[in-house]
Amino acid sequence: MNSKQLMNKAADNIRILTAAMVEKAKSGHPGGAMGGADFINVLYSEFLIHDPENPLWEGRDRFFLDPGHMSPMLYSVLALSDKYTMDELKQLRQWGSPTPGHPEVNFARGIENTSGPLGQGHTYAVGAAIAAKFLEARLGSEVMGHTIYAFISDGGVQEEISQGAGRLAGYLKLNNLIMFYDANQIQLSTRCDEVMFEDTAKKYEAWGWKVITIDGNDCDAIRAALTEAKAEQERPTLIIGNTVMGKGARRADGSSYEFDCGTHGAPLGGDAYINTIKNLGGDVENPFVFFPEVKEMYDNRLNELRTIVAERKAAKAAWAAANPEKAQKLEDWFSGKQPEIDWDSIEQKADAPTRNASATVLGILAENYGNMICSSADLSNSDKTDGFLKKTHAFTPGDFSGAFLHAGVSELTMACVCIGMALHGGVIAACGTFFVFSDYMKPAIRMAALMELPVKFVWSHDAFRVGEDGPTHEPVEQEAQVRLMEKVKNHSGKNSMLVLRPADVNEATQAWKLAMENDTTPTGLIFSRQNVNNLPEGTDYEQTNKGAYIIAGSDEDYDVILLASGSEVSTLVDGAKLLKADGIKTRIVSVPSEGLFRTQPKEYQESVIPAGAKVFGLTAGLPVNLEGLVGSNGKVWGLQSFGFSAPYKVLDEKLGFTAENVYNQVKSML
């Protein structure tokens, strides 16, 4: 155990670096990080288990930072752990720097998650804790007995998602989850008591958490709380640390600058910065240094970790020798190796809803993927993720032998939990709900895309054909919104998301195949509620992997190209019959993913939709869904308003999604 004097000096060292980093960057958030320095110091110098030589070691503890604006605190402690250089700390918030304003996932550097909008980071931790429990149930505590730590701020507690994360973690009895709440009672614009007076401890206790309240700047209290939390066998633990915003900060006149909103989101500045560095024992002329005794303490910890890891790896080797099948699973699951699926042998019921086809595939995945977890936001029997559930069983408190998570009515929480599972590694995560409720998931979808995580988002009830439920439940603009992610490039230069809306049950099988093969970005799968006619006999469904392909009229002698995605394709097929009777020749193109189509060679794109061709597009969403493909030489029939409450076949007639209207629109266009 390190002395209190040394631990306090280490925390002050982190505070000095924090203030200096923000000052040099001329922007940032020093106050919260200065207050949280004591906890992060105790955690990394005495508790967090990781492998100094192999940051990807699957048995490591994981730390999830929720308030990403407190990044200087994390970068500083990771620099003490040899993950960053001092020069890199000096480049906080600069172009090309590995120290961006909010941390971005980088396992090699010890960054377990990208910290985005408040509330998401600690929910990732819940997902990681679930993944760890799931894997422990299959592989054993010898290799999966690690701890998930999270750090949350006042803002994260206020975000609505904390309700879902707190409820789920408590219900499932995630005793491998320890969360520190940095309760400094200050936020960017106000004190917390100007917007809330709830009893946070009682709230988490009501959710089933163990709650420990301490002085969050007292290293002895932090150590004792972490020790108690580690010993907890039944519940997740929340450590409420009452901390001092801007601890150690001084104003230009030398008076205390602590507990002040002014330290939250701006450099301390001028004489306030100088006085603060002096007060903390730093050198104003050279603040970017490690105190020798502090660096020695962290070096000693790294050596301790090498011994701990060596012991655990020896135990793992003995476990592997005794459990070769489990050892192979561990290797396969964390390397991303997947089982062989005979996709061509999957039989689908003809002319069925594509959500039903998805259920068929999910059942096969449940039987063949030992490391897949599926979830639904209280809609499994409607979004048909119950195809997976029927082959396994749901998690229950303390029991993770199943592979299905009933997330409850909490779409954003569910999405972030799945992100946390993906970040943990070793598992494949999928989650489902109605497409219209993807609106609740957009912040998480964006973060999954930014982090390049292969979460599978399953959305059923894809269009106005939800029918009687009315416009509140009928997607209109949602497809356009989600498909925008196909147009945004991630930092690897690829489309940040794959979005697939299959035209029939067989395309749905191929869509799932593409989703499972896609291990570099999230995938959105959009399925119908209603029956959809099969595409014409002879359709080469494997061409789904090109994003768009010809399903009828492939010869060059045509008058117009008809294109659509999803159930509108079958409407085009019926419309083409009327056009044919009138002597108009058509080519029909199914476009499950424009983003995927745009990545194909130009020659292929031109062969499917030649420049200058007359093109008619049909979409149950906004016309913009197809305008990029149709171009100025064509026309798109789509929705211009919200939907209506009526049987879906009535809506087809009223809104113009019929063969007759396809005929009329094409005739008028030609």
Residue ranges of each PLM-predicted region?
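Conserved acidic/glycine
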Residues: M1-M34, I152, G156, E160, ...
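Short, well-ordered alpha-helical microsegments
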Residues: E159, I222-R223, S382-K384, M414, ...
